[in-house]
Amino acid sequence: MKMNDSSKLKKLYQIEEKKFAERVRRYEDIGHMMDTHQFYLEDVVLKKEEMLYKYISPSQGIAELSEEDSLGFDYEFIHKSVGNKEWRGGISTGEMIKVRKLPCTNLAHGGERNARTSSRMQKTKGGRVYACEIEGCNKKYTSSFGLKYHMKEGHSEEKMNIFKPYVCPFSGCDKKYKNNNGLKYHIKHYHDGQTA
């Protein structure tokens, strides 16, 4: 018997859950692993909330959805190239879940756009709504996961105390780098054709 796409994805999700559970059992530092697991659970909940708005039935409004109607697992997280596919399940009425695609406004693509172009265009169209609140940090992200990673990795004491002696010579640019190669790359890609 041939498995449909939804069954394959559920199976993949179950395999990943088992792998994670095995890592939890093998890990010696239970306290550290519980923190990691908490982050993992928060990420899954946030991702499901974001997906809920993408994968609703066309005949249902957001206000009509209940907790039972939410997806059983995160389709996009496991299978990135969903495109125009339809998935069965997840909605209590058994209706099809349609993955919405917005029409492309870029004429260079001939009105069509693939998944790679779609995400790139959304990121460059000012969709960065999650901003870092630390004073002096102007980083913005398209998802809460990017911001969460930035807060965890970008503002750690280890990262904050790195000596960066190579300063961009252009006025108004306060970028600093650990080595000369980083500065050269920055000047070539961000200040090409400008004079210092």
UniProtKB/Swiss-Prot annotation:
It comes from the Eukaryota. PROSITE patterns: ZINC_FINGER_C2H2_1, ZINC_FINGER_C2H2_2. One of its GO terms (molecular function) is zinc ion binding. A zinc finger (C2H2-type) spans 130-155, 166-191. Keywords: Metal-binding, Repeat, Zinc, Zinc-finger. Gene3D superfamilies: Classic Zinc Finger. InterPro entries: ZnF-Chromatin_assoc, Znf_C2H2_sf, Znf_C2H2_type. SMART domains: ZnF_C2H2. GO terms for cellular component: nucleus. The keyword Zinc-finger applies. The keyword Zinc-finger applies. PANTHER family: JUXTAPOSED WITH ANOTHER ZINC FINGER PROTEIN 1. This is Zinc finger C2H2 protein ECU03_0940. It comes from Encephalitozoon cuniculi (strain GB-M1). The lineage of its organism: Eukaryota, Fungi, Fungi incertae sedis, Microsporidia, Unikaryonidae.
